[in-house]
Amino acid sequence: MGRKFFVGGNWKCNGTVSQVETIVNTLNAGQIASPDVVEVVVSPPYVFLPTVKDKLRPEIQVAAQNCWVKKGGAFTGEVSAEMLVNLGIPWVILGHSERRSLLAESSEFVGEKVAYALAQGLKVIACVGETLEQREAGSTMEVVAEQTKAIADKIKDWTNVVVAYEPVWAIGTGKVASPAQAQEVHANLRDWLKTNVSPEVAESTRIIYGGSVTGASCKELAAQPDVDGFLVGGASLKPEFIDIINAATVKSA
């Protein structure tokens, strides 16, 4: 069976009660491809998770944007994987480049978080990606492989993992990796999984692209053989997110 297209919407630290209501209403009213064709997950800030989960159409799932690396306790400001499970939140985004850079989360720490979240029953969108300096130095694959290895070292079962390749230089900048650039990294990542994890994991694991994906760029990116979907930032707050979801039909055509 082929890899089902996956579209995640990362709302980041955005939204008010009324804005969230507008986004949810837009998604509920939108004509989107069937769940047989595309899996859709949106990730609002923690405070809006229960509201969005309750009001959003059932075929769109909800993700947290982060969770703590171990069981809850004296960790002020953190949210544990167990809390998310208790709320019925099925997904979590881990290792986003903004947390790696702004909060100094190391690859090893991200690997530990992924392993713990999976062990509690969450599904994980695990993010990897290089900076502009790293790309210009020709070390893209070295960086992405190191980040992926830190996850592979901690987990054995990849069933509930989606890998998101996010070139950091393309996040929020309006710059998009060309379809060829995205395909090259995705194919190399899949080869890395084949060699270092297993051919089965390489074949079944979805590798999605994140980095200024828009309604204008999504179809050409979706047509690439190793691009299995998107992790969308700013555009996931806008009506064009519907168009990005529907880029999944390029794969099923």
UniProtKB/Swiss-Prot annotation:
EC nos: 5.3.1.1
Keyword Cytoplasm recorded: yes
Family membership noted in the UniProt record: Belongs to the triosephosphate isomerase family.
Catalysed reaction equations from the record: D-glyceraldehyde 3-phosphate = dihydroxyacetone phosphate
Name this polypeptide is given: Triosephosphate isomerase, cytosolic
Top EC class of this enzyme: isomerase
InterPro entries with a match to the protein in the record: Aldolase_TIM (IPR013785), TIM_sf (IPR035990), TrioseP_Isoase_bac/euk (IPR022896), Triosephosphate_isomerase (IPR000652), Triosephosphate_isomerase_AS (IPR020861)
Keywords of the record: Cytoplasm, Gluconeogenesis, Glycolysis, Isomerase
GO molecular function, one term: triose-phosphate isomerase activity
Pfam family of the protein (one): TIM
GO biological process: gluconeogenesis; glyceraldehyde-3-phosphate biosynthetic process; glycerol catabolic process; glycolytic process
Gene3D superfamilies membership: Aldolase class I
Organism: Secale cereale (Rye)
Extra remark: In plants, there are two types of TPIS, cytosolic and plastid.
Localization of this protein: Cytoplasm
Annotated positions binding substrate: 10, 12
